[in-house]
Amino acid sequence: MAEQYSLFSTVYDMFMDNVPYIEWADSIEQSLKKHGINDGIVLDLGCGTGTLTKMLSDKGYDMIGVDSSEEMLSIAREKDENTLFLCQDISEFELYGTVRAVISTCDTLNYILDEEELVNTFKLVNNYLEPDGIFVFDMNAPEKYEEVLSDNVFAENRDEASFIWDNFYDEDEHINEYVLTLFMKDDKSGLYKKHEEYHYQRNYSRDEIKGLLDRAGLEIIENFEKDLRMYYTVKVKEGCKLGNIG
């Protein structure tokens, strides 16, 4: 996924200004405190440019951000010099110790196309979570791929950049291909240059997510849906801390 954001990283925050980061930060803080996590280390998997990471850092949590795009992380480091940001594949991440909680937002986990890699990600979460820790994440609902994105085209125009977003959904493989055509303004010439990036996400059903979590020794303790996004809070199942999983 690193190459996918090499150019888009420079305009990512501009086009994501409609994302409800404040709402997400408040909701995550509420979930953490509900489960007795008032401080300590929290891992943000797929942190991107670090907007949400910084908000939670400001709320008193010691954040670690992991993302596979060095370009995205360079922007994140500018926002928060006090947070540790690591350039790693989220399905193979390594930490120095355990964390109180793990979060993953903005359908980051849908970018993991292989279910075995997603299971491995869940197992790593199991491994690094403290015994009373929680994992808070979201994924796109199946209906978003099947009914909203499907084979539709979206576009947006800003002064500094514009994009055309083509979607191609493979119903058999459950893979959505995004072809992102960017028109970015060159500061020197004032002209717009065309760039293309390709992004891929997998549509996971609700039953698949539950089953993959179960394989990793995790269980859902809270779940709700809003705006075609599925929100989960999970914990390690009793007796299934990594090392005891069959």
Enumerate the language-model features and the residues they cover.
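Class I SAM-dependent methyltransferase SAM/SAH-binding core
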Residues: 43, 50-92
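A short glycine-rich, Lys/Arg-flanked "PGG" loop and its adjoining helix->strand segment in the class I
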Residues: 119-131
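Conserved class I S-adenosyl-L-methionine
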Residues: 1-37
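SAM-dependent methyltransferase
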Residues: 136-210
